[in-house]
C-alpha cells in the first residue's frame, strides 16, 4: 500500500498550465445533499436547508459549464458533493461530460452504488472513483456517519466496482470517532489490493458553519500529529518508519502528498488553486479552492471565462501569514 503519486505527464501538464493560467483541472460540486450525516462534514445540508438557499443547478447547466470549461482548457474533472450518486440525473451528467472527452474522477461514500449503478458506470467509466472509508465496521459508521449499515454497503460497492474493472482509490478521513479503526481500514485495503490515502487533518467547517471552527469533531494538533505518524508507519512499514526517524529525515513526514505551502510571511500560495485548478460550488460560485470561504463569481451568470479570470485574480492576491 502506498500513497498514489501523479504520473510525470500529469505533473508536467499542470506545471505548464499554471504558468499560462489555463484551468486544466477542476471540481464540480453537484450537490450539498448526502444520504449520510458525517459529524465533521464541511458542506452537507438537508434538503430544507438547500432549498432555502436556492434550487440545485440542472444537468443542462452543468453540461453547458463543462463545455465552456473545456474550451478554456479543462481536462481533469472531479465530480463531488455531498453525494453525487444521490442526484437522479447524475447518470445524464456523467455521460454528457464523458462524451466531451474529459478525464473524470468521482468522489463518493460508495453506499448508493449497487449492481444497477455499476452497469451504467461501465458504459461511461470514470478514470477513478474515490471512495472514503470512514471505518472498518458498521458500528463505526453508525457512530461517525449516522449510517449503521454503511460499512456493509460500501464494502459491497467496492467489490462490485472491482469486478467491473472500474478503478477505486480509498480515502480515509480520520477523526476521534474512527481512529480506533485505522489498522482495520489499512487491513481491508490490503486485502482488496487497493490504494488508501489517509489524513488526520480535517479542514474547519468554514462553509457549513463558521461558528463551529475550533469546536467541531477534529483532533487536537497533538493528536493529529500522532495519527499522521501512525499513518506513515502503516503506509511504509514500521521498520522503514523507524529508520526514517533514526535518520532524522523529517521532511514531508506529516505533510499531505502534493502539499506545498510556503511559510514565509507575505508569500503567495504555491498550490494549484487559481493557477491551473478551480472549484465550482453547488450554488455556482467559482472558487480557486473549495476550502476557501470567499464568495466567488456566479459562473452560471457571468460565464466560465470571466469567473475563472476573477478566481485567478483572487488567488494571486492571497498572501500567507507568518503562522
Residue ranges of predicted features:
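Conserved alpha-helical substructure of the radical SAM core
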Residues: 1-128, 227-230
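Radical SAM enzyme [4Fe-4S]-AdoMet core and its adjacent flexible, acidic
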Residues: 122, 132-134, 139-270, 282-287, ...
